[in-house]
UniProtKB/Swiss-Prot annotation:
This is Transducin-like enhancer protein 6. PROSITE patterns: WD_REPEATS_REGION (PS50294). Component of the subcortical maternal complex (SCMC), a multiprotein complex that plays a key role in early embryonic development. The SCMC complex is a structural constituent of cytoplasmic lattices, which consist in fibrous structures found in the cytoplasm of oocytes and preimplantation embryos. They are required to store maternal proteins critical for embryonic development, such as proteins that control epigenetic reprogramming of the preimplantation embryo, and prevent their degradation or activation. Belongs to the WD repeat Groucho/TLE family. It comes from Homo sapiens (Human).
């Protein structure tokens, strides 16, 4: 309904659109808006405040329209770049081959062409094509460096960022063969001449120092095996990023079962077993990892090899770490390490091995790492270590069959336990009892308060590893035949709790004793629950797993496999 007396707008719109609010020209939205506003101002009750609100809404909508137009423009640029790079791959067969002589005018034309005369797409296409055609042997030339920045100028929204990552992923796939040719470094410190391993194995050169392939002092077979193992350890750049994230130290960050709405009323973290292990870090130790230890208090991992201990920080964000925070090398010529032990308070690290005059106690609480105590063991080769900080005692088992006890306050020898003809391979201490196992398949229990002979429990296979339950009266045995046994510490009761397919090399109870980790020659990290030893799940590794450890906060597991260690984060 209209009225002839109703005033009309001063100026009608110059153009109209079949759809309201949509126009082909940039000036039309302004005229439409002004016309509508002038109509509204003719009403006597039209508030100036309402006019200001409409003005603000209009400019906001206009800004959104400009952003959408800019967004479409950026997507068009990215698609043009991808299309140009795809076309260049089809033209490579028409280019001049290295064996054919190029015309004299061709290099001159490339030389005379400047960056000012080239568009952004031409520069991207030229460098990308040159990088894709370059042989692997020319990686040392400056032109092989990737041409894009970490944050290109057109990263303004999520969609464009994802498109750019898809485009960059094409180059990551092409770069895989080139990356695998690079030799990984073993650390920041070079090894001393006296730190070589005894026996027939020659001293390997420091891999962190560049050298030609023919200059290697190791035999061809050894170098081939070492390169092969590194190729297995290294993951392609595209796959390593799936666990490229920081390790969580905040309990609120975990989606554990007892926090879920469907959790049972009595469910508690002390009764839970892991439901998932997520690989968070690979630590490239550089030689066979013989023992590992992890501290959630200091947030460090300790990896033990024949030539020394390497200390790794867990606070960074890197998928594969090649550079340890510290390196504790062997200084005695002809000696090598065999094992290490982190004290329960994470303030000390005990190390022992072969041809060493003592077991070293490293001070982890000092500003700089140093040996604060030497526990004498001249002429003995250490196999395993344990400690009781409440009683200030340290324990070690040796290949000669001796178990030695030291007083940590004055480093004196308290007692030597003898009677193992085939040596002692593993040792655990719980209360006043010392449990030992070895190649003779006999589990022995010594009481520190008496001088009586130990209790003996005979098994049918060699005892490779021991671990005591922190909450119950059980000792866990890992056997050479793949069996796992629980032996009661208060009686003769025992039962088998699962079996692996090959030799078990290490077992470790969790801090609450509700599950344990088991590793061995089957290339798997297995998680088993108490008390029946039900297998919860297994995590595959690339090679036999020699050792494992569980952090005191019940959140991390570290394993040693080949020349590297893996750090897993636990979700319950």
């Amino acid at each position: 309904m209209t009225s002839r007396d109703q005033p009309r707008p001063k100026g009608p719109p110059k153009s109209t659109s079949p759809c309201p609010g949509i126009s082909n020209s940039e000036s039309s939205p302004t005229l439409n808006y002004q016309g509508i506003l002038n109509r509204l101002k003719q009403f006597p009750r039209f508030s100036p405040h309402f006019a200001a609100e409409l003005e603000s809404i209009y400019y906001s909508l206009h800004k959104i329209q400009q952003d959408v137009a800019e967004h479409h423009k950026q997507i068009g640029n990215v698609l043009q770049i991808v299309e140009s790079c795809s076309q260049l791959q089809g033209f490579q067969s028409e280019e001049v081959s290295p064996a054919e002589p190029a015309s004299p005018g061709t290099p001159q034309q490339v030389k005379d062409k400047t960056l000012q005369e080239s568009s952004f797409e031409d520069i991207m296409a030229t460098r990308s094509s040159d990088w894709l055609r370059r042989p692997l042997g020319e990686d040392n030339q400056p032109e092989t460096q990737l041409f894009w920045d970490k944050e290109p100028w057109f990263w303004h929204d999520t969609l464009t960022e994802q498109l750019w990552r898809i485009f960059a992923g094409v180059h990551d796939e092409k770069a895989k063969p080139r990356d695998r040719q690079q030799a990984p470094g073993l650390g920041q410190e070079s090894k001393a001449p006296g730190s070589c391993d005894p026996g027939t194995d020659p001293c390997p050169e420091d891999a962190s120092t560049p050298r030609p392939p023919e200059a290697s002092s190791s035999p061809p077979e050894g170098s081939q095996d070492r390169n092969t193992s590194w190729g297995v350890v290294q993951e392609p750049p595209g796959r390593a990023s799936r666990f490229l994230q920081s390790i969580s130290w905040d309990p609120e960050d975990f989606e554990d079962a007892w926090k879920r709405p469907d959790a049972l009323p009595g469910q508690s973290k002390r009764l839970a077993v892991p439901c998932k292990l997520e690989k968070m870090r690979i630590l490239a130790h550089g030689e066979l990892v013989l023992a590992t230890a992890i501290s959630s208090f200091t947030r460090h991992v300790f990896t033990c090899g024949r030539r020394g201990i390497k200390v790794w920080s867990l606070t960074g964000q890197v998928a594969e770490d090649r550079f340890p925070e510290s390196h504790l090398p062997i200084q005695t010529p002809g000696a090598f390490l065999r094992t290490c032990l982190l004290s329960s308070n994470s303030r000390s690290l005990l190390t022992g091995g072969y041809n060493l005059a003592s077991v070293s106690v490293w001070d982890l609480a000092a500003p700089s790492l140093h040996v604060k105590e030497q526990l004498p063991c001249a002429g003995l080769n250490c196999q395993a270590l344990d400690a009781n900080l409440d009683a200030n005692l340290a324990f070690a088992s040796f290949t000669s069959g001796v178990v030695r006890i030291w007083d940590l306050r004055d480093q004196s020898v308290v007692r030597d336990l003898k009677g193992y003809p085939d040596g002692v391979k593993s040792i655990v201490v719980k209360g006043y009892n010392i449990w030992t196992g070895g190649p003779d398949a006999c589990l022995r229990c010594w009481d520190q308060r008496t001088i009586m002979k130990p209790l003996e429990y005979q098994f049918k296979s060699q005892i490779m590893s021991l671990s005591h339950s922190p909450q119950e009266d059980w000792v866990l045995l890992g056997m050479a035949n793949g069996q796992q046994w629980l032996q009661s510490t208060s009686g003769s009761q025992r039962h088998m709790v699962g079996q692996k397919d090959s030799v078990i090399l290490s077992v470790k109870f969790s801090p609450f004793g509700q599950w344990w980790a088991s590793v061995g020659m089957d290339d798997f990290l297995g998680v088993y629950s108490m008390p029946a030893g039900t297998k919860v799940f297994e995590v595959p590794e690339m090679s036999p797993v020699t050792c494992c450890d569980v952090s005191s906060n019940n959140r991390l597991v570290v394993t040693g496999s080949g020349e590297h260690a893996s750090v897993y984060q636990i979700t319950y």
